[in-house]
Amino acid sequence: MEHFQQVEPFDYVIFGATGDLTMRKLLPALYNRLRMGQIPDDACIIGAARTELDREAYVARARDALERFLPSDILGPGLVERFLARLDYVTLDSSREGPQWDALKSLLAKAQPDRVRVYYFATAPQLYGSICENLNRYELITPTSRVVLEKPIGTNMATATAINDGVGQYFPEKQIYRIDHYLGKETVQNVLALRFANPLMNAAWSGEHIESVQITAVETVGVEGRAAYYDTSGALRDMIQNHLLQVLCLVAMEAPDSLEADAVRNAKLAVLNALRPITDATAATETVRAQYTAGVVDGENVPGYLEELGKPSATETYAAIRAWVDTPRWKNVPFYIRTAKRSGKKVSEIVVTFRPAATTMFGATPASNRLVLRIQPNEGVDLRLNVKNPALDVFNLRTADLDTSIRMEGGLPFPDSYERLLLDAVRGDPVLFIRRDEVEAAWRWVEPILEAWKHDKAPMQTYSAGSYGPEQATQLLASHGDTWHEASE
């Protein structure tokens, strides 16, 4: 088994420790890092939630979560017991004062006062401020404390500002880690390597050579048990305001001075500030929103969004946007962003289409080169090139794909994106986390779109579950001579 560099001893306190995120992602991620030798023996993981449990009952839940969400072949009994031995639990209403905070304080007091302490807020964002207030009241914030904030950071600029102010009152910005798990994905991080470590790509990475960029994240599942939450969010808030805009930033940003956190985040911020505003006047031509209706997904009949929700709604389950980055590098290059529930397939990818070669020596204009960075389900890179069609008597062209799977040495599977990010917070490395001004710049661009939709400037469309979206989304690209990636395969 390959071992990675071990981090220093730490205390990880997870608020919302009985919730789905903790059980499905956080505990399995931490277990995997222990399995790879990165978590020291004296590390402590403390769960905190309102559910009345003792330590034994919480450990039993954690064991069930590991067995449910991880492959059985990596659950060695000795490793599982070593991991569970690091767990503790406190019954705690994080929004209120009370003696249960003293119980948490007692657990943390067992360690040296200068030990790294990470508070992970896997709770509703409206609780972030009160949790920080209580951490301060009970003197649990130390110079080596960090706080990890899950999305969404607000539902608009006002609520995002309130959340950031509430946390910032007690934690300086350098101790705040706003997590976006997309930035923990290997293919997303590889955007920087492909661009800046390969002169072949770097020289062609501008509007002079690139015709369009598509950023897609669609899935086959519906809202299912999250209907009440999702109806207050929608596709634009849930995916584009955070994950997909971050991906766009990595594709479009100028080369940072270094890979230091602020250098990278400054470069991303410049992209967000350069996004052309979408207003009431342009929403109809630059955006499409839609809801799925009943259809067939993976051979099964599924209900429409309104049927699942059980009431009328103006919340979109599909969003497509044609964005423009108003910098010299990206003049006249459209960035197409889309996300959807109940799509015909599950895929997240970046598609870069290059301008065709300006030559007629082969009789017809060669097909455009196309670079596809697959984020999920199978991470990898495809590059479509023009090659000679094998024949003895003619010199015709055909396209051929160079397909590269990005694999770890030794054939190990990629770590889940949370695995890297959880330990980056321990290391104090914020490069893959979001700075406050990035969050607010993203909201400045997204909020006018939400307002335009609220005023019905881009009418709500529909699409059948199991399809690739409404016809209007196809027209969004066709008006610029483009097609969505799956239509060209």
UniProtKB/Swiss-Prot annotation:
This is Glucose-6-phosphate 1-dehydrogenase. Keywords: Carbohydrate metabolism, Glucose metabolism, NADP, Oxidoreductase. It comes from Gluconobacter oxydans (strain 621H) (Gluconobacter suboxydans). Belongs to the glucose-6-phosphate dehydrogenase family. It comes from the Bacteria. GO terms for biological process: glucose metabolic process; pentose-phosphate shunt, oxidative branch. InterPro entries: G6P_DH, G6P_DH_AS, G6P_DH_C, G6P_DH_NAD-bd, NAD(P)-bd_dom_sf. NADP(+) binds at R50, K151. It is an enzyme of class 1 (oxidoreductase). Homodimer. Its EC number is 1.1.1.49. It catalyses: D-glucose 6-phosphate + NADP(+) = 6-phospho-D-glucono-1,5-lactone + NADPH + H(+).
